[in-house]
Each structure stands twice: as structure tokens, then as C-alpha cells.
Amino acid sequence: MIRFVLFISCFFLIGTVVECNKDGYLMEGDGCKMGCLTRKASYCVDQCKEVGGKDGYCYAWLSCYCYNMPDSVEIWDSKNNKCGKGK
């Protein structure tokens, strides 16, 4: 019984430390989507992994889209679009 409780405790601890379930477009410092039109094929995959994501691709050769990123990563959102609005 003690082993079962320890197993469950470890399972929940691991789940709370690294939550990687966020998908979306990577965002540049100016609030715009991270472009990939003129980049090499692995650019988006590399950028996604750099922020802790599992995988990514260049969506329609325009913007980097990532899978399974940590919840702490800020992603582009059409509702809060700051692109081109200045800081």
C-alpha cells in the first residue's frame, strides 16, 4: 500500500513540474507570429524545442506552429493580438 501511495505521489509531482500541453504559434518580441518563410526547413522545429516544445513546423510557409509547449510559453493569440501596435 505504501508503494502505491508513493507511486501516485510521484506521478502527480511529475505532472505538476512539467506541463507540456500547449499548442500554438510562436511569438516574436513585437507580438507578431514568428515568421519562417525564408528560413531553413528545420527552423521551426529548432525554435519550438528551444522553448521546451516537443515538435513544430512552418505553417503554410509563413509562421512557426509548435506542439506540447510548457504553459509558461507565451503564444500568439488573435484575441490579444499586439502585432504592429507598438509597445
Curated annotation (Swiss-Prot):
Domain LCN-type CS-alpha/beta: 22-84
Pfam families found in the cross-reference section: Toxin_3 (PF00537)
Positions bearing Lysine amide: 85
Domain of life, per lineage: Eukaryota
Tissue: Expressed by the venom gland.
Major subcellular site: secreted
Entry GO MF terms: sodium channel inhibitor activity; sodium channel regulator activity; toxin activity
Coiled-coil positions: none
Subcellular location(s) per record: Secreted
Family as reported in the entry's similarity comment: Belongs to the long (4 C-C) scorpion toxin superfamily. Sodium channel inhibitor family.
Name of the protein described by the UniProt record: Alpha-toxin To2
Organism field: Tityus obscurus
